[in-house]
Regions:
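Residue-level preference for the first positions of well-ordered beta-strands
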Residues: 4, 99-103, 139
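Glycine-rich phosphate-binding loop signature in dinucleotide/nucleotide-binding domains
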Residues: 44-47, 95-100
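Short alpha-helix plus adjacent loop in nuclease-associated cores
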Residues: 83-93
């Protein structure tokens, strides 16, 4: 069994935005919400063995905030996670065989596109009840029933939980069984 966590960056700061999206920082609200999600995650006593994160300023800051609470030892910046497709995330994960649990800190719509690839439509409907997208600072956990990441597909994936910054959505445990 492998475990994948998706963490969307904290709410970005639009004040003084100069058109350089890559360099936008996190707002104070984004900092607090990211801390809130990290504290909820800490209570679960789960271990993240590898963190892959986008090169954007807000993603790096989200990692720093999360890491102060969670202590992730193995972190790798992936420049292509910024403005990537869901297919890129899927292929990136397939190359990570040494680890049991991976956290990806990234962006929308990349995460929604990735979920469309990895989770069948019945599970996606349950996620969409939370909104049309993954909100900033939200954390999703997916259990993937494979022995190596190279074997991931749409089968036997279970959406375990979705932690939103303002509330804990809870255990979902909806299994993906679509071919």
């Amino acid at each position: 069994m492998k475990y994948l966590y998706l963490l969307r960056h904290g709410k970005s700061l639009w004040k003084d935005y100069d058109g350089n999206d890559h360099e936008r920082d996190i707002s104070k609200k984004g900092i607090e919400k990211t801390k809130n999600v990290a504290e909820k995650f800490l209570l679960k006593n789960e271990i993240i063995e590898l963190c892959l994160y986008s090169s954007s300023r807000r993603t790096k800051k989200t990692l720093r905030i999360f890491n102060k609470i969670i202590q992730i030892n193995n972190k790798r910046e992936k420049k292509k996670l910024y403005h990537c497709s869901g297919t890129y995330i899927f292929n990136l994960i397939k190359k990570q065989n040494a680890k049991k649990s991976i956290l990806i800190i990234g962006h929308e719509p990349s995460f929604s596109e990735f979920l469309d690839i990895i989770i069948n439509s019945n599970v996606k409907i349950n996620l969409s009840l939370l909104g049309e997208k993954i909100y900033t600072s939200s954390l999703i956990k997916i259990a993937i029933d494979v022995s190596t990441w190279a074997n991931i597909n749409r089968k036997n994936n279970t959406l375990i939980y979705h932690i939103c910054p303002d509330k804990y959505v809870g255990e979902m445990k909806k299994k993906s069984n679509q071919s």
